[in-house]
Regions:
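Conserved phosphate-binding/catalytic loop of the ribokinase/pfkB sugar-kinase fold
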Residues: 1-15
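Glycine-rich phosphate-binding "P-loop"
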Residues: 1-4, 21-25, 71, 75
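N-terminal active-site wall of soluble small-molecule enzyme domains
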Residues: 7-11, 30-39
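Short beta-strand/loop segments at the ligand-binding rim of alpha/beta enzyme cores
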Residues: 19-23, 41-49
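Structural motif
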Residues: 24-27, 50, 101, 191
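Active-site-adjacent C-terminal substructures of enzyme catalytic domains
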Residues: 36-39, 49, 58-187, 198-203, ...
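Short, well-structured alpha-helical segments that form the helix of a local strand-helix-strand
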Residues: 185-196, 208-209
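C-terminal cap of metal-dependent C-N hydrolases
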Residues: 198, 208-233
């Protein structure tokens, strides 16, 4: 949310979506945002902070008002300075969840390891931040109204050098995390399953393979690639 929040308008959106707007990103420095977070939460939305140059104090105000996560941590976010910790300082100091784009481009592998050490395995959520080009060949695509060029899997705005999301898939994110950290599948898998489910308060239904939960199953082969079986003989 890059405009001042309008809870009545958000209520209309939520009604039109049959209550399915579950997650929203806000920029803490936008006027009225910290004060509106409780109202967004009451509408059934989990609130993340991100796409922001907010200062430390304003970011903490949002966290204290109920923000539960940071959107693609480190990216599109004012970084830590020893005299001005900014939003990054509040995110690392707090116990909110941190999203991480683990494609090896948005975050250096060492940065991923640093984030895991700072927050712990139970507070990091691996995301893709993918655009429509995910899983497709290199070429020109659209991100909203902006043309995007994908070269060697790297998506950047056609006019400029800024990254425009990623082409990462969840399966590749899993393999990257295992490679970046040297940790086991069992240690890394919750970053893509349990943690997001817990953050969204749906862990009673999805996020792990337990009796009574939805059979939301992905089968991996020995190399941790998604195993798509062929048709029966």
């Amino acid at each position: 949310m890059l405009i001042s929040p309008d809870l009545e308008l958000l209520k209309e959106y939520q009604k039109a979506a049959d209550g399915n707007i579950r997650y929203i990103t806000v920029s803490p420095e936008v006027k009225g945002v910290p004060e509106a977070i409780k109202g967004m939460t009451d509408l059934g939305m989990k609130v993340a902070i991100g796409h922001s140059g907010a200062d430390y104090e304003t970011s903490w105000k949002c966290i204290n008002e109920g923000a539960v996560a940071a959107t693609h941590t480190f990216n599109a976010m004012k970084l830590l300075h020893q005299h001005f910790p900014a939003i990054m300082g509040a995110v690392l100091e707090s116990d909110i969840y941190c999203e991480a784009i683990c494609d090896g481009r948005h975050l250096h592998p060492g940065t991923v390891r640093f984030l895991l050490k700072m927050k712990g395995l139970d507070k990091v959520i691996a995301i893709t931040d993918s655009i429509m080009a995910a899983g497709l060949p290199d070429g020109e695509y659209m991100l909203g109204v902006n043309p995007v060029i994908v070269k060697d899997g790297d998506a950047k705005l056609k006019y400029g050098d800024s990254r425009a999301g990623s082409t990462l898939t969840t399966g590749c994110a899993l393999k990257n995390l295992i490679k970046f950290t040297g940790r086991s599948l069992e240690e890394i898998l919750p970053l893509l399953t349990c943690n997001p489910a817990k953050m969204l308060d749906v862990y009673d239904r999805i996020g792990s393979l337990d009796t009574g939960k939805d059979a939301d199953v992905v089968i991996l082969d020995e190399e941790y690639s998604v195993d798509v079986p062929g048709p029966p003989p």
